[in-house]
């Protein structure tokens, strides 16, 4: 099923029993987090808080609180269908030359479909039904959550940030958290390697001292939101990818104060500029690690204009120790990653990012091992192939008789197939998540690879153990008489 905007998605979720309207007054300060956290852990519905205390705008929370709703948002009926999206992205990332005329014709519809999904610019849009400018701008109108007791201020969490580099034809979409520090000021927390930060850096180099235009869309359609967090190849824009997911071109409208283009159906849009050199201390905030992050300095966005739909919906979330909504997104997007990795490394059978590992800090990979040292090649490939795994601290590589998603299996393999000295790969001075306070230096730390495969000649001189396998005939016999035994 495809959804034209956030409201259409909300309506369809409600019809399926996947959304609950909360009519009791609930505070955005701590209370919404507590309710959403309990609901997510119970695999419950999305929540629409219709009467946030002190505000007239309803708050939508826990929208992607189950992998199934993430799949729905990407236009799939089941989480398993996300593998097909991954296969499409893998093909678009590295398309293979046609093997012949027939093969070329078979691939043509894919490229036609991609070309046909170029975004469409419109002149009028719901996101500009109401326009607030100048001194009338007040971010205090938005029911921005304060998620945890130690949070320093309200935090915008689902802002889809739109930027454009001076030397680029295409816009960048990114989701960065934004601390509210005044009626028209927010802190743009983007890390130095992220697209928005790179665009801003290039702007400052080419236009020193000039204000940099930025837009933040809140409450875009689900395909556009999820397109911004998916590993889309550089040859494909997030807006075009969202069109592929949705089955229709993404409609955009030019901002009223800049040439940036934002989703026409967004609920709320913040337009503004970053003045080079204007920085502010951001944090502390409770984060997806389960800890409060340290304070650091980031650019300040001055909001010059707020546009929104009539009776807008504010889309929000919280981040904390997994499981949280980003962790659930990680579980679903894991299925997209698998075919992309398999395209580059066909020996990979499965790839798993455990949500309790903050969704990216640990990976378990199962392979069809083909030669000594194979596991080490794969772990190095995982670290280098996709930028999404730049911060993965631990990579465990096992044979394909192990279930990567079963810790009982993985721990058994670690303790029986691995020698700590021989089978551990340590790499120092590598990029590490800025939020990882365990690293000796902010943004720089080490990585560990664990070769948990059965060892081949050349890797060991010892006779390798043979795994115990049950006798099939005996198993069938006991299956037949089991109920008669009366044990259960």
From Swiss-Prot:
Record-listed Mn(2+) binding positions: 172, 238
Catalytic activity: a 4-hydroxy-3-(all-trans-polyprenyl)benzoate + H(+) = a 2-(all-trans-polyprenyl)phenol + CO2
GO cellular-component term (any): cytosol
UniProt keyword terms in alphabetical order: Cell membrane, Decarboxylase, Flavoprotein, FMN, Lyase, Manganese, Membrane, Metal-binding, Ubiquinone biosynthesis
Active site (record annotation): 287
Root EC class: lyase
SUPFAM superfamilies: FMN-binding split barrel (SSF50475), UbiD C-terminal domain-like (SSF143968)
Subcellular location as annotated: Cell membrane
Cofactor remark: Binds 1 prenylated FMN per subunit.
Pathway membership: Cofactor biosynthesis; ubiquinone biosynthesis
Cofactor(s) essential for the protein: prenylated FMN; Mn(2+)
GO annotation, biological process: ubiquinone biosynthetic process
MF-aspect GO terms: 3-octaprenyl-4-hydroxybenzoate carboxy-lyase activity; metal ion binding
Gene3D superfamilies: Single helix bin (1.20.5.570), UbiD C-terminal domain-like (3.40.1670.10)
Record carries keyword Cytoplasm: no
Binding sites annotated in the UniProt record for prenylated FMN: 175-177, 189-191, 194-195
EC number: 4.1.1.98
Protein's membrane topology: Peripheral membrane protein
NCBIfam families: PRK10922.1, UbiD family decarboxylase
Function summary: Catalyzes the decarboxylation of 3-octaprenyl-4-hydroxy benzoate to 2-octaprenylphenol, an intermediate step in ubiquinone biosynthesis.
Subunit structure: Homohexamer.
Entry's family note: Belongs to the UbiD family.
Protein's name in the database: 3-octaprenyl-4-hydroxybenzoate carboxy-lyase
Organism this protein belongs to: Pseudomonas savastanoi pv. phaseolicola (strain 1448A / Race 6) (Pseudomonas syringae pv. phaseolicola (strain 1448A / Race 6))
Name of encoding gene: ubiD
